[in-house]
């Protein structure tokens, strides 16, 4: 209502103000008659300075001229301010004369002129002394005059021209306005001294102003700067710490259209004029004016076809002086008139007159532009057209009159014209654009997603677009040269783009785009803002243990825009509780080890709400309407932001209070895995080699698969002549004689010689072949047994491997079920968010939930009324979401407190509370990460059987020579029990009777319990049965009333419980199954046999060694290095040379070398 009042009110009698803000960088005009209430208000009236310059003087030496406009500067601006120095300028020809504003059609000026001489005041005439004149002039005529005493304006300080209602301000007060809004085309100040005059040229922008008692105290320009975007979108300049999503709607947008078809053919209408022969036409009676016209047809504009088919029975008569046709202005015949000729006007008529001169004279008489004559061998009944022939008779013919002018309004054609419009889909990518896609309009950021969508057959059945829940286009497809191209429409600005407010200051932008100058922050990118402008990237500086400002994950964003990493303070000590006992009459004497699991949610999923985008989507009309709702979005965001901030701080405190110092240090020693064999994963211990390094170097080793008996064979054949004992060292395996299959060269020589010798004398020496045959059979046995064992082991390996795979699959399946149960519990959080998104499809009583459809079907007022319902409904959904997140935060906060207690009491120590850490007496708890929480696996022992004992509270002792006293069990020692007439003490949680010692008791001074005896007057609530009747008293209050308890059997409720106990048992079974799958293979050994090199190899090595020594000695001798030889090797023939250098190179001090 405020803005509407500003536009409609008459402002001539209202004083207005124009205040300067921001180092004189902009001006804010507001009308004093319509001052808004205290607070922030968004409307027009702000003008940002875009150009500043000064002027010292322009009047010359004689002084300036008053009562006239002599100096002007040309502009094209929304506002121009001309200001004098702070002290102002006097109203005199020695300083100030005239200032004016030119609004193209009229000029507003202020001047003074107390002169009565002729021509002294050409515009205003004489102005009274000590008065000034404010006038408006149009076409050299004054239509507004206002004379003001100088007591109101003692000196000239400023004149400001504003396009809004052509307002003019003198010294900050409104002195002129009109109903027109026009830019300032020129302005100027005519003065001699007192300057300089400062000119400020401004452009108009919206502003958010803060008013106190009707006066603007602060102004924020809606100019696209970060501060302007934030303040003007949320209608406030005061922000609490947090993150504020924003949409930059001030970006310059391009436009493009996506057409359904690549080309459109449009067939234009073709008008037919059909002419025919006129029967019973009367001949003329003399002259062309008596020729009667028939079938006159006049074309208007468009395409025409003139049908003269009846002329086929007529004979065309060409022009022959005065005879026949006459059409020099028409270069066509009637038979070709439809060949695409262009006319500005066209009219055709038929007439019957003399062929002799009828056409030519008709053209001369301006009856037609062209005339075509046709003969049909008619009678000679037509009269002449010339003065001397008016009574003569001539042959009658058909005359076709054509009246035309050249142009482009009319075209003749033989067939309808088809206009082909080629549609080119020039899609603008990767920038904010306004689009018209298949008839749906909007704005968005278009990206090509063909590479991602081409394999999923989207829109494969001829569809053109996929719409989102608001009815706007989400994905559309365009037929390209090489196939279908898919495009995604995103909001012009990323929904996740948020302003960061810390310490009440706008310090940065958090966005999902990796822009220049940004730095990564968790899964977002942070851009620092200094003094309202972006700053280049800075690294994260320093660590803090806590953050009183805004936090994002583990990062603290400070009021100066810097970022620090939050490193929670670690715990330095562990605290273990003392043992305690519970009160039971039955004392357990046997126990079972029990494993129980417990899931506790410690964090919640935070949401980021772009309120404006959720409510209005891309609808510009809805966004304009939404401005009337004020700070409702700010209120919702403040709730969500505060929840997120508290969540981060409590989560950091949770980890800082539970994370022990050095918890990441692994302990790898003294690790016992019990029956679970993981030896295959450990490094085997080193063992001594069977041969030395020299043996491995000087002998060739051959490895083969051996049997367990091969180790004994190797020991038996050890030594230099061990090969002679080969057959003697044979061993038996399962009753079979076996020898290793490897035969050395010595063995081969030995057995070959034995075989050859056995064949030398036939049967006499044949017994010599027995060793050869025996060793051969033993080695064949060795190979056969080895192959059999390999096959058996292979079968065992396959069976065991299959069994292990089965158990692993079962383990994975069991783990998957446990995780699924965790997921089911955690996913309960998203139900309210799902409901919120589903609200986008609800119409809330409107005709549709699609905003664009509403504005297309209804007029503006009706559409706003319908959209108002949707806005109210969606805001309600957001409010429900904010309330749900707030309630969820309180619930999760309590869960975190419980988790802290569990970690401190169950994980870091043994709990003394029964069934607090699992079910039963606590032994050990192992925590595991889970989605949004922690899973505790509690190991406890629970009673299996109990012993029923007689418990004694204490003993009363009556000594012979002293007063009586009592003894009771000391705290934590257990209880006194009686067993078979004897007294013992045992623990409360485990039956372990033992003798009572002095350390187990506490001595009391008396055996009696102390009570305090009081009478009835002390405690007035005590009553006797004889003076209080309950039935009588209750009848006063509960008479004639009926009370029914609810049927709790019908009370159904569902609580999500995480139960992975059975899955843990199945995993334990899988572990046992994996242990069972260990393979007990038949023992095989590796037999390593060393083969000595032949004699010629050793001979070659000896020759090579001798040659190497000779060459080395010769090198030492020739290079004068024999000292080394003498000292190291003691070569006697060289001793005489050892005291000096070689004689070949001996020189003395007095030698001259040339």
Curated annotation (Swiss-Prot):
Site description Cleavage, residues in chain: 538-539, 691-692
Which species? Avian infectious bronchitis virus (strain D274) (IBV)
How does this chain assemble? Homotrimer; each monomer consists of a S1 and a S2 subunit. The resulting peplomers protrude from the virus surface as spikes.
**Coiled coil stretches, renumbered:** 823-867, 1056-1084
InterPro entries with a match to the protein in the record = CoV_S1_C (IPR043607), S2_sf_CoV (IPR043473), Spike_S2_CoV (IPR002552), Spike_S2_CoV_C (IPR043614), Spike_S2_CoV_HR1 (IPR044873), Spike_S2_CoV_HR2 (IPR044874)
List GO terms (cellular component aspect): host cell endoplasmic reticulum-Golgi intermediate compartment membrane; membrane; viral envelope; virion membrane
- Name any one Pfam family assigned in the record: CoV_S1_C
Q: Which UniProt keywords apply?
A: Cleavage on pair of basic residues, Coiled coil, Fusion of virus membrane with host endosomal membrane, Fusion of virus membrane with host membrane, Glycoprotein, Host membrane, Host-virus interaction, Membrane, Signal, Transmembrane, Transmembrane helix, Viral attachment to host cell, Viral envelope protein, Viral penetration into host cytoplasm, Virion, Virulence, Virus endocytosis by host, Virus entry into host cell
| Family that this chain belongs to | Belongs to the gammacoronaviruses spike protein family.
Under Gene3D superfamilies, the record lists:
1.20.5.300
Q: Which of the residues are on side Cytoplasmic?
A: 1118-1154
The protein depicted here goes by the name: Spike glycoprotein
Please indicate the ranges of residues that lie on the Extracellular side: 19-1096
Share an example GO biological-process annotation for this protein: fusion of virus membrane with host plasma membrane
For this protein, the record's PROSITE patterns field holds: COV_S2_HR1, COV_S2_HR2
Please report the PTM annotation for this entry: Specific enzymatic cleavages in vivo yield mature proteins. The precursor is processed into S1 and S2 by host cell furin or furin-like protease to yield the mature S1 and S2 proteins. The cleavage site between S1 and S2 requires the optimal sequence [KR]-X-[KR]-R. Additionally, a second cleavage leads to the release of a fusion peptide after viral attachment to host cell receptor.
Q: Which residues are glycosylated?
A: 23, 74, 102, 139, 145, 164, 179, 213, 238, 248, 265, 272, 277, 307, 426, 448, 514, 531, 543, 580, 592, 670, 677, 948, 961, 980, 1015, 1039, 1052, 1075
Renumbered to this chain, region (Heptad repeat 1 (HR1)) spans: 770-875
């Amino acid at each position: 209502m405020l803005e509407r009042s500003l536009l409609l009110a008459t402002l001539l009698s209202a004083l207005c103000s124009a205040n300067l803000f921001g180092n004189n960088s902009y001006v804010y005009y507001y009308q004093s008659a319509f001052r808004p209430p205290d607070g922030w208000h968004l409307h027009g009236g702000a003008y940002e300075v875009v150009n500043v310059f000064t002027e010292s003087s322009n009047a010359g030496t004689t002084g300036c001229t008053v009562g006239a406009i002599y100096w002007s500067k040309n502009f094209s601006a929304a506002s121009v301010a001309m200001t004098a120095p702070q002290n102002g300028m006097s109203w005199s020809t020695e300083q100030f004369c005239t200032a004016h504003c030119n609004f193209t059609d009229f000029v507003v000026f202020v001047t003074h002129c107390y002169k009565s001489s002729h021509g002294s005041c050409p515009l205003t005439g004489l102005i009274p002394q000590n008065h000034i004149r404010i006038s408006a002039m149009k076409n050299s005529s004054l239509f507004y005059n206002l004379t003001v005493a100088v007591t109101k304006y003692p000196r000239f300080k400023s004149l400001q021209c504003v396009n809004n209602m052509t307002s003019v301000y003198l010294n900050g007060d409104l002195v002129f306005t009109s109903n027109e809004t026009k830019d300032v085309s020129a302005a100027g100040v005519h003065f001699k001294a007192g300057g300089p005059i400062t000119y400020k040229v401004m452009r108009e922008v919206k502003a958010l102003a803060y008013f106190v008692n009707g006066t603007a105290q602060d102004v924020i320009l809606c100019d696209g700067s970060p501060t302007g975007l934030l303040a003007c979108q949320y209608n406030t300049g005061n922000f609490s710490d947090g993150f504020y999503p924003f949409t930059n709607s001030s970006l310059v947008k391009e436009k493009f259209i996506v057409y359904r078809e690549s080309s459109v053919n449009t067939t234009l209408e073709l008008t037919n004029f059909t002419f025919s022969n006129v029967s019973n036409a009367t001949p003329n009676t003399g002259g062309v004016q008596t020729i009667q016209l028939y079938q006159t047809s006049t074309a208007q504009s468009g395409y025409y076809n003139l049908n003269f088919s009846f002329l086929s029975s007529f004979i065309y008569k060409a022009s022959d002086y005065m005879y026949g046709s006459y059409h020099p202005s028409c270069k066509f015949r009637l038979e070709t008139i439809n060949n695409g000729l262009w006319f500005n006007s066209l009219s055709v008529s038929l007439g019957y007159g003399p062929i002799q001169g009828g056409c030519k004279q008709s053209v001369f008489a301006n009856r037609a532009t062209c005339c075509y004559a046709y003969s049909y061998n008619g009678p000679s009944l037509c009269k002449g057209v010339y003065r001397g022939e008016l009574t003569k008779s001539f042959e009658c013919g058909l005359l076709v009159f054509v009246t035309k002018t050249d142009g482009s309004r009319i075209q003749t054609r033989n067939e309808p014209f088809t206009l082909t419009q080629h549609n080119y889909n020039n899609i603008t990518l990767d920038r904010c654009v306004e689009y018209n896609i298949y008839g749906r309009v909007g704005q968005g950021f278009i990206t090509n997603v063909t590479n991602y969508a081409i394999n999923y057959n989207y829109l494969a059945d001829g569809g053109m677009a996929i719409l989102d829940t608001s009815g706007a286009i989400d994905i559309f497809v365009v037929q390209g040269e090489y196939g279908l191209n898919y495009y995604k429409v995103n909001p012009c600005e990323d929904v996740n783009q948020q302003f960061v407010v810390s310490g009440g200051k706008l310090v940065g932008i958090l966005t999902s785009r990796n822009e220049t100058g940004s730095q990564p922050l968790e899964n977002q990118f942070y851009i620092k803002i200094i003094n309202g402008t972006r700053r280049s990237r800075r690294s994260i500086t320093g660590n803090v243990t806590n953050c009183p400002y805004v936090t994002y994950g583990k990062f603290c964003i400070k009021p100066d825009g810097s970022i620090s990493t939050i490193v929670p303070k670690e715990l330095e000590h562990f605290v273990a509780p003392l043992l305690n006992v519970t009160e039971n009459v039955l004392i357990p004497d046997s126990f079972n080890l029990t494993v129980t699991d417990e899931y506790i949610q410690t964090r919640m999923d935070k949401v980021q709400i772009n309120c404006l985008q959720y409510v209005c989507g891309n609808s510009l009309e809805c966004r304009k309407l939404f401005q009337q709702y004020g700070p409702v979005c700010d209120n919702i965001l403040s709730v969500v932001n505060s929840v997120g901030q508290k969540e981060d701080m409590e989560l950091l405190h949770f980890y800082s209070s539970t994370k022990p110092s050095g918890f990441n240090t692994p302990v790898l020693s003294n690790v016992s895995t019990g029956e679970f064999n993981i030896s295959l994963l450990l490094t085997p211990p080193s063992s001594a080699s069977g041969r030395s390094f020299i043996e491995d170097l000087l002998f060739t080793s051959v490895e083969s698969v051996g049997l367990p008996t091969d180790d004994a064979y190797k020991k038996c054949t050890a030594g230099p002549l061990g090969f002679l004992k080969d057959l003697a060292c044979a061993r038996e395996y399962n009753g079979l004689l076996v020898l290793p299959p490897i035969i050395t060269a010595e063995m081969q020589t030995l057995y070959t010689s034995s075989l050859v010798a056995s064949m030398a004398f036939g049967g006499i020496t044949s017994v010599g072949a027995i060793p050869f045959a025996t060793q051969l059979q033993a080695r064949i046995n060795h190979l056969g047994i080895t192959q059999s064992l390999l096959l058996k082991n292979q079968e065992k390996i396959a069976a065991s491997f299959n069994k292990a795979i089965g158990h692993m699959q079962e383990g994975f399946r069991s783990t998957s079920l446990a995780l699924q149960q965790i997921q089911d519990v955690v996913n309960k959080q998203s139900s309210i968010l799902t409901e919120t998104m589903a609200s986008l499809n609800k119409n809330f009583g409107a005709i549709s939930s699609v905003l664009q459809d509403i504005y297309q079907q209804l007029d503006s007022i009706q559409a706003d009324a319908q959209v108002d319902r949707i806005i109210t409904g969606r805001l309600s959904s957001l409010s429900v979401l904010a309330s749900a997140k707030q309630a969820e935060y309180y619930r999760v906060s309590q869960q975190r407190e419980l988790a802290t207690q569990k970690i401190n009491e169950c994980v870091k120590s043994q709990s003394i509370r029964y069934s607090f850490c699992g079910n039963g007496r606590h032994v050990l708890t192992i925590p595991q990460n889970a989605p949004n929480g922690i899973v505790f696996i509690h190991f406890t022992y629970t009673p299996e059987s109990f012993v029923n004992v007689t418990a004694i509270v204490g003993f009363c002792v009556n000594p012979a020579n002293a007063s009586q006293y009592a003894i009771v069990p000391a705290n934590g020692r257990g209880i006194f029990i009686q067993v078979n007439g004897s007294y013992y003490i045992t623990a409360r949680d485990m039956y372990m009777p033992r003798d009572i010692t002095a350390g187990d008791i506490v001595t009391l001074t008396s055996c009696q319990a102390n009570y305090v005896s009081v009478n009835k007057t002390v405690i007035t609530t005590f009553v006797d049965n004889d003076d209080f009747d309950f039935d009588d008293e209750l009848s006063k209050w509960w008479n004639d009333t009926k009370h029914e308890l609810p049927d709790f059997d019908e009370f159904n409720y569902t609580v999500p419980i995480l139960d992975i106990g059975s899955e843990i048992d199945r995993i334990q079974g899988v572990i046992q199954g994996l242990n069972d799958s260990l393979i007990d293979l038949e023992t095989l050994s590796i037999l390593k046999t060393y083969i000595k090199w032949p004699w010629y190899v050793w001979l070659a090595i000896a020759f090579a060694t001798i040659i190497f020594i000779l060459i080395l000695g010769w090198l030492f001798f020739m290079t004068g290095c024999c000292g080394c030889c003498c000292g190291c090797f003691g070569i006697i023939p060289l001793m005489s040379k050892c005291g000096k250098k070689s004689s070949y190179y001996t020189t003395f001090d007095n030698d001259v070398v040339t």
